[in-house]
């Protein structure tokens, strides 16, 4: 599906979808609880549906109380031998350790761009925790068979924190205590979200500055009443739209959130946008924007939003952390460079771990999403400033995280 975004200004108030990162963690914790939990404020993007499908396959009984509320009776009693994670990297790395709690073989399958994303970092740690793994050269599909044991192991945290999240949620139910020695942990705010979610279900996880995690075995997940907060990754795109093309207020978000992408507000301030923070909303509005420097190592999902912000700013912006982008839905560093070049914006990624973006006039262009939801949204925001229209090929991929993005953007056009 192609989507065309013409030059225009925006003004209005929007509520983003719920945090899919929190939603998937809460769904997993509800599965691991042997009683009934209630999750509120859920909205169903593709990734959240994948997680819901996973917990049902692994034994959860789910009742839809209303359009945004689920009652979930947990318990690991697999109903099948195949766990289909869709195109969700988090669901893959989260539910593989959880499936390894079972004493039966479970095959993890995916689709689309996920089949090109490496999963090798899970294989050796799982084997050292007693899981039998039938490998596929580090890619999906593969088979795991538990039970997963505790122990003391090293885990590489330099590529992603998602597998560590899966271990942290699964290992409290193992028979033995576990110490994880984590090398070069990245995206540490996401680990904070995991520890927070576990705590809200009565499970304790301790860590030493993300270098060591201690997980006591034999714990029990307790039922929770869990309200999912708004998604800061989605909010970031909307706030950048306000900063470059008018004024946008985003509701149901708080700067006190543990979500990594609250950091977008720091970038907006550095770019000299006007930012107002209220108790449950944030507003960003346009002022003449200047080039900025920002380190996105621990919030790599912000890169596409930061690219749109930098393209609208005067001067050369410097964004660090590009090493985190290779194994997303696409190689995001390459995609940002290629697609923004079509719109006349120079993006330099020749320096290791650094992206330089020279802001300027954004030209009318026809660009590709690369099957990446955040790239599609980034180019749409840039389209608000182009000298004609920005046409995005493959725009349907926004359904992965924010199905109503283009409709919401249209609502606030003036």
Regions found by a protein language model. Give the residues of each.
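Structural preference for solvent-exposed beta-strand-turn elements
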Residues: 1-414
